[in-house]
């Protein structure tokens, strides 16, 4: 069984975050929300967020800046920008700088939003399935599995 995809939404408007929560609560994602773009790096690192969806126009920081930071710290995280401000230049800049994978315009269409997130989910699950095991973890597992007892007998741990 695959683990649920973790999605973080950043928007300075609490009403938008509440609407997103209602729209997506039954989609099988583990959802996180914040109005503070300065919390994003901490949340992405602590919770191993798979997808970050950021509003563009926020008082403290733009969505492009938030998603560029996520890209720098966690390059494999899928990044999506969502905005009601059809700022074509910012969108082009974000795409050209590789900050975003998708752009969603507000007001969003619920079905389209769900489809975008499920498409990202499928891509993430394929990446997980194809991922090479972490070498450090493989060594730890190997050492737990094969041990030598005091008499020199090799003991294989069934775990």
Where are these regions (language model features)?
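Two-component/phosphorelay signaling modules centered on CheY-like receiver
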Residues: 2, 14-33
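Acidic catalytic/metal-coordinating carboxylates
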Residues: 5, 35-36, 62-65
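Active-site residues of response regulator receiver
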Residues: 11, 55, 83
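Acidic, metal-coordinating helix/loop segments flanking the phosphotransfer/catalytic sites
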Residues: 33-51
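Short amphipathic alpha-helix used as the core "switch/output" element in two-component signaling
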Residues: 42, 64-78, 93
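Receiver (REC) domain active-site loop signature in two-component systems and cognate sites
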Residues: 58
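C-terminal output helix
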Residues: 107-117, 121
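CheY-like receiver
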Residues: 122-159
């Amino acid at each position: 069984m695959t683990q649920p995809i973790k999605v973080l939404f950043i928007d300075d408007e609490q009403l938008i975050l509440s609407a997103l929560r209602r729209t997506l609560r039954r989609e099988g994602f583990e959802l996180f929300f914040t109005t503070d773009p300065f919390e994003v790096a901490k949340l992405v690192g602590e919770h191993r967020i798979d997808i970050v969806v950021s509003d563009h126009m926020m008082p403290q920081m733009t969505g492009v800046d938030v998603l560029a930071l996520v890209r720098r710290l966690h390059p494999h995280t899928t990044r999506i920008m969502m905005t009601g401000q059809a700022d074509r230049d910012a969108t082009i800049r974000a795409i050209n700088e590789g900050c975003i994978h998708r752009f969603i315009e507000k007001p969003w269409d619920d079905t389209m939003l769900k489809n975008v997130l499920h498409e990202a989910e499928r891509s993430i699950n394929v990446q997980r399935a194809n991922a090479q095991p972490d070498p450090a973890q493989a060594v730890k597992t190997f050492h737990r599995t094969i041990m030598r007892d005091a008499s020199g007998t090799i003991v294989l741990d069934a775990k």
